[in-house]
Amino acid sequence: MADDMEAVALSELRIAHGTIEARRAQTLRRVPVFQSALCRVRQGTKLLEWGARQARAGTHDVVLMPAGQELGVANLPDAQGYRAEVLSFSPALIARFRARHGGLVDTQLRQAATASLCVPLDAHAALAWDQLTASLASSTPPALLAHQAEGLLLALALGGHCGPLLLDRRDPLAARVQQVLLLDPGADWSVAKVASHLHLGASTLRRQLALEQRHFRAILEDVRLGL
């Protein structure tokens, strides 16, 4: 049975690679992210907007694109145009990485709601990226691809930059409340307004937060303080 479960799990550990190219500036608003992904700019600049926050990514950065997030993006060419690579990861691969490295990523997950989605790409992560994309272009066995993908995620996590990418729509309600509040931290938020965004009743939201030993006002204060 254990071997069967491992085989099924391996078949779900999928990685996809794509390239975005443009000669002229592109602006895309309210782009939904369906699978967790990373974007590495090779030429030009990417402007990123999520909630009330903004960031600029160049060739020494990587953009984290968490599943379930809605982003505004602008791709700005330089003299040679705009080019970026995108790697997307199946939910099963993200879940396995979280399970294997919980001790390392737990703090990053707690801080993910206020972390930037544009982070530095250090030498270790850049090398892991290049190895993974080279393997995806060849007939590399799926088990090795999954290992290399987790190596890239680990390189980002060791740099303290993996939290937002690992957020799951099945995460605790408090984390999802934080994401809603980050849409506009200074707004006049109420339990009812946040519950509406999450398609819950206000009493249900309060009750489920209480089960997690969290309180709406405390979460709101944390978001506004940037904790």
Predicted regions and their residues:
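Residue-level marker of regulatory loop/turn positions in helix-turn-helix DNA-binding domains and
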Residues: R30, R169-R170, L183, L220-E221
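N-terminal regulatory/effector-sensing and dimerization cores
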Residues: S11-R110
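Linker/hinge segments immediately adjacent to helix-turn-helix/homeobox DNA-binding domains
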Residues: L145-R170, H197, G201-S203, R207
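Cyclic nucleotide-binding regulatory module and flanking cytosolic helices
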Residues: M1-M5
